Amino acid sequence: VSHIIEENGVRLRLNIVDTPGYGDQVNNDRCWDPIVKYIKDQHSAYLRKELTAQRERYIQDTRIHCCLFFIQPSGHALKPIDIVVLKKLSDVVNVVPVIAKSDSLTLEERQAFKERIKEEFAFHNLKMYPYDNDELDEEERALNAQIKVNLLRRKPEVACANDFTEHHPIRRCWL
């Protein structure tokens, strides 16, 4: 699904790639491989186009820049498969964890689950966007710290549906 977003005179093509069926099999061994391969393939294809001597004036960017990783609000911790997949994905793309269907939780349940997830991310050394980077200057570190605080404190709405049409209701999800 593609959509053009324009804000402050800047046009951006937003491409949404869904991965239906991920982790739904009886044997989920290496179920993340097709996702990671797709992300890497998109980056490689863009780089090949960029490095050609006679490159096109406009190269459509099909790279995956961000992964919204929806975590089921089970009331427990992350599933073992989620931990493995988050590690694999964070090596190739910016990962933003989102609590799926969080509007079905009370404020207290949502906060407790969010804290549990943050603890698990720290325990398993999972990377969450924005990343800490030794090469950043002080201003960039401060900006990244503020982004991280905003992501953890605020509750921005995220539209989540299989299709953004009038036939599918859009549920609210909260970071």
Listing of model-derived features with the role each one plays in the protein:
Residues 148-154:
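Short, disulfide-bonded extracellular cysteine-rich repeat modules
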